[in-house]
């Protein structure tokens, strides 16, 4: 009898954190574009070009955009956004729940509360 060896290869995704960090870097360095319409033999053609010429042109692997995101700080019935006014924020956080970001530069009020709660502790 002979021996048989099977080798199986497959692609696996990197860690979710690695993918998230990669996408965040792309988002942070995205290039703003403008849509230009010009006439060619087959009709009107739309192309994208960088809005600012002093930045390098994006490559095929770069992220680009041509519309700005809506302002989520203020209420907007069209988008269904309630804004961020009167939201609870975390003074010590530099993340999306932090007061610097969530309050959109409007400042924030600090409130201290004392509560008595039964904790069902067992000693």
UniProtKB/Swiss-Prot annotation:
Glycans are attached at residue 90. GO terms for molecular function: cytokine activity; frizzled binding. It is found in: Secreted, Extracellular space, Extracellular matrix; Secreted. A lipid is attached at residue 1 (O-palmitoleoyl serine). Disulfide bonds have critical and distinct roles in secretion and activity. Loss of each conserved cysteine results in high molecular weight oxidized Wnt oligomers, which are formed through inter-Wnt disulfide bonding. Signal peptide: none annotated. The keyword ATP-binding does not apply. The keyword Zinc does not apply. Keywords: Developmental protein, Disulfide bond, Extracellular matrix, Glycoprotein, Lipoprotein, Secreted, Wnt signaling pathway. Disulfide bonds join 89-104. GO terms for biological process: canonical Wnt signaling pathway; cell fate commitment; neuron differentiation. One of its GO terms (cellular component) is extracellular space. It holds the Pfam family wnt. Ligand for members of the frizzled family of seven transmembrane receptors. Functions in the canonical Wnt signaling pathway that results in activation of transcription factors of the TCF/LEF family. Required for normal embryonic mesoderm development and formation of caudal somites. Required for normal morphogenesis of the developing neural tube. Belongs to the Wnt family. This is Protein Wnt-3a. It comes from Sceloporus occidentalis. The gene is WNT-3A.
């Amino acid at each position: 009898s002979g021996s048989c060896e099977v080798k199986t290869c497959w692609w696996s995704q990197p860690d979710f954190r690695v993918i998230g960090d990669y996408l965040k870097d792309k988002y942070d360095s995205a290039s703003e574009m403008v849509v230009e319409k010009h006439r060619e033999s087959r009709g009107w053609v739309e192309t994208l070009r960088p809005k600012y010429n002093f930045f390098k042109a994006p490559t095929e692997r770069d992220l680009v955009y041509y519309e700005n995101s809506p302002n989520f700080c203020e209420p907007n019935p069209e988008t269904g956004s309630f804004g961020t006014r009167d939201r609870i924020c975390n003074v010590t956080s530099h993340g999306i729940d932090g007061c610097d970001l969530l309050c959109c530069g409007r400042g924030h009020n600090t409130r201290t509360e004392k509560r008595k709660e039964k904790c069902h502790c067992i000693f």
